[in-house]
């Protein structure tokens, strides 16, 4: 068996920062801080190997683990000068989880372990503070009971509230020694009620606590968190056991969390919160509203503990310069002595991540490449957050702490269950006293989060920032009744289902729906995206067919349009009647008449698009979907169509019935329409090239056209359509006395097209991989129907991910690889692109880079994500 226990502390460390795989993120940080000679409580880390062994050996420990554990405790006793379980000089322990990847609040922690009646008395004697000893015992019974013994945590809270009410006490800090003794007695009875015994033996407490932490790795909340954040279940958790240091020893003791820069904005100054006379869980759980580390008032640490503040500032700077990244630091102050409990790379908003990355490049701490690798591409969604338009003179009903930026409107809900249930039909704002890891699903589906208690580093704040959701915490002027499902702000009563708006940037809450403003990119955002474009070899284009889409695309840095779905233009209310006339027309003459009416409208559509894009490439796909998608479905629309065509309704119904297809997505669509109904493609070709000529002649705009044929499966299809297309273009060149320049390409979206790409490539200038249909036809799964079984497939690990979100490299990717190799073998100059949903997915973009594609094309709002992902792929793979 490999080494399972690594020491750290005042005598140095067995490990270092590079050992996250076995020591976990927290353990590696503690080891590294030991090596940096920082003040940390002595302790040891039990490696992730134990977790993996535990789950593969029927929840048992390895043979010699218990004896190794006792040796480690003995070593800790020698270093600290205290004895575990002693009735004269007791050593108390903290037991904390720590996986390779940080999972804030998802795993279990036990403090003050080793407590019993005798130890409590000894602790009181040694420190001369009975209230502190009893408070520590109370905390242990509550944490051990809820975490290890699975006693519902609200039962402990109910006992406390009952005693406080009877004694007419409102603050925990006012609880007397006598009241603490009564609460402890009731806590003990609760333990005995649930487990038939009170576990007093310190080693039995320790072993059961270790098992509880290991079990928490597979807890429902941790599994959900890992799924949401794509964290592997195989890495397991390490366990960190440390000598307790106490932040609840009185007014010269405290606990807190500090960030070396602002996690919301990236501003370069120490940011954080602390609580006097408290333990670590008080601040991260959000059950008490903390005070700031830096502020202009007398309640800040800077004002109350200036010497400790100075030391903390120096340590924070040292840690950031050592790790070359913003740090999240947990600390405890015991009788004015500072201890660092943990440091880790801090979670941050997308805005903060970009600002910090740019600052650190300017400070010459890191390179542009390192800066880009620190940006989570998906987090850039946060840059698209809306904000409230305050120019309208709005009045808020409440104000709390601005815990996570952005604005959101939705119906107020008061439980995670209701959030999940109602989110299917509404945007929801989850309102809670405070959140806990069990609320993770409800938080995930909510548009925003409000908590009555808690601060900027509470569970709600940290998780909301990680999810990119607006969050307001510490709204002490609000009161909530979760049972009655009402929220009260002064005289205003908000019931479940009432609409509220929250501003996570200012901490304000409003009744009703507020006017919102779309965000704009900061100069730092533009700069880091420019760096991405400098580095990446994969160009990023947009899927766009409207002027608005094109404008948004250009704003977000698109280098062209990679997919213009021309059929989307047909759904305009002025065009759809003509399209229906064209489809339903009983004879060729009527059809041609409808086509001619459509021609000038389509011409204007294309002109508008080319104007926005100027000389950037615009890849126009000819009509693709089956014609039934344009046809009326309601009786009223059918009657209107009959009237416009001056035909009986029965004939319309007969024609609709004749056009019905059993499987239209594999039926009469794409190039098959162009071959069987050539007048449609002919009209589109005339509209496109007329638009190009008119812009050239009248507005001096030189268009960069790429013309694409959809759903090819056979080289004969492309040869036939190519002939028809060039015949129309030749006539237009004669009419306008102008030579058109363009490239011709095809979608590769069917397996047969991929396999037959050698012949197809000879006929075209480029391939564009339509990965949506290629995935559908490779798997034999409809994208519209996969939701009925995908959750089960993911749960059973039949699929590793949704194949319509992340490209299946093994199957679909293999077809793309074949198509590229065979296509290039017959056409060395073949250009390559991808335009499905996968083209905006970072993992898929990495694959497209490895396949040496020229560009990807995604929705306008995925462009910033794709630009960063393309640069990261280049940095990783060259």
Swiss-Prot record:
UniProt: Mg(2+) binding residues: 749, 773
Q: What class of enzyme is it?
A: transferase
Q: Which residues carry this modification: Phosphothreonine?
A: 457
Give the catalytic activity. Answer: pyruvate + phosphate + ATP = phosphoenolpyruvate + AMP + diphosphate + H(+)
Family annotation (Gene3D superfamilies):
1.20.80.30, ATP-grasp fold, A domain, ATP-grasp fold, B domain, Phosphoenolpyruvate-binding domains, Phosphohistidine domain, Pyruvate Phosphate Dikinase, domain 2
Q: Where is this region: Linker 2?
A: 503-537
Coiled-coil residues are none
Q: Which GO terms describe its molecular function?
A: ATP binding; kinase activity; metal ion binding; pyruvate, phosphate dikinase activity
Sites where the protein binds substrate: 565, 621, 749, 770-773
What segment(s) does the record annotate as region Central?
405-502
User: Record-annotated residues binding ATP?
Assistant: 96
Q: Where is this region: Linker 1?
A: 348-404
* Pfam families reported in the protein's UniProt record: PEP-utilizers, PEP-utilizers_C, PPDK_N
The region called C-terminal is annotated at 538-878
Q: Does the keyword Hydrolase apply?
A: no
Disulphide-bonded residues: none
> Which EC number applies?
2.7.9.1
**InterPro entries, per database record:** ATP_grasp_subdomain_1, PEP-util_enz_mobile_dom, PEP_util_AS, PEP_util_C, PEP_util_CS, Phosphohistidine_dom_sf, PPDK_AMP/ATP-bd, Pyruvate_phosphate_dikinase
Cofactor(s) in the UniProt record: Mg(2+)
Q: Which NCBIfam families match?
A: PRK05878.1, pyru_phos_dikin
Q: What does this protein do?
A: Catalyzes the reversible phosphorylation of pyruvate and phosphate.
Domain notes for this protein: The N-terminal domain contains the ATP/Pi active site, the central domain the pyrophosphate/phosphate carrier histidine, and the C-terminal domain the pyruvate active site.
The entry describes its oligomerization and partners as:
Homodimer.
Further details from the record: The reaction takes place in three steps, each mediated by a carrier histidine residue located on the surface of the central domain. The two first partial reactions are catalyzed at an active site located on the N-terminal domain, and the third partial reaction is catalyzed at an active site located on the C-terminal domain. For catalytic turnover, the central domain swivels from the concave surface of the N-terminal domain to that of the C-terminal domain.
What family does the Swiss-Prot or TrEMBL record give for this protein? Belongs to the PEP-utilizing enzyme family.
Q: What is this protein called?
A: Pyruvate, phosphate dikinase
